[in-house]
């Protein structure tokens, strides 16, 4: 994804402003995974958000490798890792595409040497069929493939902000024209059109979660599979910083015709405060995301 590879993309803000993933979700992955834990590869790892979390949250793997096409992202991941060298001593990072495992070396690539492959908040940018076939070629028998992501958050306690959460990312006066397609549309659809091939993987599990369900306890408890529930307490200022991590925001800022326009993220804050004047830029409020996950085991 070209924007995240740009030298002027703020990967540090991306790392600090993006949500992390709950411990109970990693516990579910632990329970799903069978067999050895020698090597985990996290493709499309960005600044290592999930890669470094997995090093702490999952039962130990001997080696964890995060890979990403963006040298900018990998540099940030390595800086974060170097801040806690003992915690992440089994973690390394490589510049590579999601379907290229040559960094494993000639003796290991396409030789079913990987125990788990993860793709977190990135698979919407992939050639999905090419990726899953490459994963199949590199996973050992019964090795785990785990794909998950999130999009389109809401503030559950402030339904009057719902239209803002559409206008800012998708409105014509907002960031709508600046998303790279078809990737964003795939993510917005929670990758529902991308399926793990049952000829390549078995014990396939898929879950979709709509953030609005947190407003309805009945719907929340009707999920047959435990959903990936990503929620976070943020200030309006912090949420604006999150908006600034979006690839579309970066493209919007690069467009000369927006030079004299009010910043989209600043407009979001101003409009939110107009609607709820009792709030301030530093008031903590809850945000919840739509999410999905897809799990499978190599046949």
Curated annotation (Swiss-Prot):
Residues recorded as bearing N-acetylserine in the entry: 2
InterPro entries assigned to the protein according to its UniProt record, in alphabetical order: Diverse_substrate_MTase, Methyltranfer_dom, SAM-dependent_MTases_sf
Main location: cytoplasm
Enzyme class: transferase
SUPFAM superfamilies per the UniProt record, alphabetical: S-adenosyl-L-methionine-dependent methyltransferases
Gene Ontology cellular component terms for the protein in this record: cytoplasm
Record field: catalytic activity: trans-aconitate + S-adenosyl-L-methionine = (E)-2-(methoxycarbonylmethyl)but-2-enedioate + S-adenosyl-L-homocysteine
Signal peptide start and end residues: none
Membrane-spanning intervals of the chain: none
Gene Ontology biological process: methylation
GO MF entries: trans-aconitate 3-methyltransferase activity
Database matches in Gene3D superfamilies: Vaccinia Virus protein VP39 (3.40.50.150)
Keyword terms, alphabetized: Acetylation, Cytoplasm, Methyltransferase, S-adenosyl-L-methionine, Transferase
A Pfam short name: Methyltransf_31
Protein task: Catalyzes the S-adenosylmethionine monomethyl esterification of trans-aconitate and 3-isopropylmalate at high affinity and of other molecules like cis-aconitate, isocitrate, and citrate at lower velocities and affinities. The function of trans-aconitate methylation appears to be in reducing the toxicity of this spontaneous breakdown product of cis-aconitate.
Protein name: Trans-aconitate 3-methyltransferase
Gene name as annotated: TMT1
């Amino acid at each position: 994804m070209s924007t995240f590879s740009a030298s002027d993309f703020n990967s540090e803000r991306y790392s600090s402003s993006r949500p992390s993933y709950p411990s109970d979700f990693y516990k579910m992955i632990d329970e799903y995974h069978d067999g050895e834990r020698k090597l985990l590869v996290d493709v499309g790892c960005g600044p290592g958000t999930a890669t470094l979390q997995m090093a702490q949250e999952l039962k130990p793997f001997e080696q964890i490798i995060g890979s990403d096409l963006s040298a900018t992202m990998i540099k940030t991941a390595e800086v974060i890792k170097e801040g806690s060298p003992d915690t992440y001593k089994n973690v390394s990072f490589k510049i590579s595409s999601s379907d290229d495992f040559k960094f494993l070396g000639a003796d290991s690539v396409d030789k079913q040497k990987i125990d788990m492959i993860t793709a977190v908040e990135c698979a919407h940018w992939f050639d999905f069929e090419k990726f899953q076939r490459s994963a199949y070629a590199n996973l050992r028998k019964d090795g785990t493939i785990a794909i998950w992501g999130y999009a389109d958050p809401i503030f559950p306690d402030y339904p009057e902000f719902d239209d803002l959460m559409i206008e800012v990312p998708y409105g014509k006066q907002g960031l709508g024209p600046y998303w790279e397609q078809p990737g964003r549309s795939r993510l917005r659809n929670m990758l529902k059109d991308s399926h793990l091939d049952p000829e390549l993987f078995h014990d396939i599990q898929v879950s979709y979660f709509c953030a609005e369900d947190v407003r309805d306890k009945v719907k929340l408890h009707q999920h047959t599979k435990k959903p990936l529930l990503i929620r976070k307490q943020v200030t309006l200022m912090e949420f604006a910083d999150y908006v600034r991590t979006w690839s579309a925001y970066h493209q919007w800022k690069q467009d000369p015709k927006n030079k004299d326009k009010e910043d989209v993220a600043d407009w979001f804050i101003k409009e939110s405060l107009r609607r709820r004047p009792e709030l301030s830029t530093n008031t903590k409020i809850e945000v919840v995301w739509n999410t999905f996950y897809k799990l499978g085991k190599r046949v």
